[in-house]
């Protein structure tokens, strides 16, 4: 929400809420206004909006990215994360923003050892075991079909899917 512009809209369905405090960033990226944006995440403020706008959001490890300019809800838990349109874009942005930052003591031990973009090998899911929770299926057939198609793609990429049953 913005006091200037009002309620942020989900660009894929203007009747749907874009979720979370980084919803403006996610909506802007999803609408094509920017190739990426940054948001702060305490308990889902990057990941929630990404999940409902068809974008990619990731919570980085605490201390890996600068929180300069962020007013923290929890100084020992808040992180800055990117919202992008693709996993590849996410990796490129992480390569640019991960590392020590002057003025943010939490990042003093941050390392730039990982090269995220170079880590995007096709074989990266070979041998991975991923838990699949199906308790949410059945509410929307279109979502169920998309979820199943995603599972098929994960298996094609070499992942082993393990069904997880949650007690209701």
Please give the residue ranges for each predicted region.
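Short glycine/serine-rich loop segments
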Residues: 1-97
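Beta-sheet entry/capping signal
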Residues: 35-36, 129, 160
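Solvent-exposed loop/turn segments at secondary-structure junctions
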Residues: 42-45, 136-139, 168
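A short helix-breaking turn/cap at a secondary-structure junction
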Residues: 56-150
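Conserved dinucleotide-binding and phosphotransfer motif residues
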Residues: 157
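General small-molecule cofactor/ligand-binding pocket signal
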Residues: 160-167
């Amino acid at each position: 929400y913005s006091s200037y512009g009002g309620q942020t809209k989900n660009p894929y369905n203007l009747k749907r809420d874009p979720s979370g405090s980084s919803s403006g960033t996610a909506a802007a990226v999803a609408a094509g206004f920017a190739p990426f944006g940054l948001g702060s995440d305490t308990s889902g403020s990057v990941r929630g909006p990404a999940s409902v706008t068809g974008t990619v959001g990731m919570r980085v490890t605490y201390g890996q990215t600068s929180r300069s300019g962020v007013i923290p809800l929890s100084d020992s838990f808040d992180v800055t994360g990117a919202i992008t349109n693709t996993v590849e874009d996410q990796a490129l942005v992480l390569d640019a923003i991960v590392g020590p930052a002057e003025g943010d003591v939490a990042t003093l031990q941050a390392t730039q050892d990982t090269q995220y973009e170079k880590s995007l090998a096709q074989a990266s899911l070979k041998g991975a075991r991923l838990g699949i929770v199906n308790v949410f299926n059945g509410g929307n057939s279109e979502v169920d079909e998309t979820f199943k198609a995603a599972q098929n793609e994960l298996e094609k990429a070499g992942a082993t899917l393990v069904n997880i049953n949650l007690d209701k």
